[in-house]
Amino acid sequence: MTRGKLITFEGPDGAGKTTVLERLVPLLQAALGQTIVTTREPGGVAIAEKIRQLILDVSHTTMDDKTELLLYIAARRQHLVEKIMPALEAGHLVLVDRFIDSSVAYQGAGRGLDKQAIQWLNHFATDGVDPDLTLYFDVPSELGLARIAQNTEREVNRLDLEQLDLHQRVRKGYLELALENPQRIVKIDASQDLESVVAAALAAIITHSQA
């Protein structure tokens, strides 16, 4: 059986990637006629969802940056072996809301932790499984935070409480990753209206599937 494809959705907070992912599922099913599995990080499986609660709990204000990183890595490992790899081995198209690049952008560029150490931990946790395609949804930090503030349905988490400068560093980290990985990462202007962003993401995935 042909191995499925792993497509990751990345971007700073407020970029709208989660909404775009949800909108894409029926469009991709119609276009590709393939089983699609959607999931998220941190989370996706029971153990990883419990780790997610630890990471994002607004009361955990004393969490050390390295502790935060290692919790993300632990959640990633469990998620990979329990959900992502079985779906890929079954030949499915797997869409993941955040993956390895989030750690480099948030804990690396954002928190200032060593990028090489993070990349090593990512490789260790994933056994070298990289995305076949990554869609990076780029949005200015000010706009992203404004969207979060306006979204009354969104539950506030610990990272939402961070200052603007951290979100700006995260965005810079993502932009650097996009420049370093042009064959894998497709940058999408997420400051556009939702329909335009969905159309751009759909086109990128279909183009990749036909390559």
UniProtKB/Swiss-Prot annotation:
Q: Name one GO cellular component term.
A: cytosol
Summarizing the function annotation, the protein's role is: Phosphorylation of dTMP to form dTDP in both de novo and salvage pathways of dTTP synthesis.
Write the gene name.
tmk
Keyword annotations for this protein? ATP-binding, Kinase, Nucleotide biosynthesis, Nucleotide-binding, Transferase
Q: Which GO terms describe its biological process?
A: dTDP biosynthetic process; dTTP biosynthetic process; dUDP biosynthetic process
| E.C. code | 2.7.4.9
The reaction(s) annotated as catalysed by this protein in its Swiss-Prot or TrEMBL entry are: dTMP + ATP = dTDP + ADP
Supply the name of the protein.
Thymidylate kinase
Q: Which Pfam families match?
A: Thymidylate_kin
Task: Tell me which family the UniProt entry assigns to this protein.
Answer: Belongs to the thymidylate kinase family.
Q: Which residues bind ATP?
A: G11, P12, D13, G14, A15, G16, K17, T18
The cross-references to HAMAP family, in alphabetical order and at most eight, read:
Thymidylate_kinase (MF_00165)
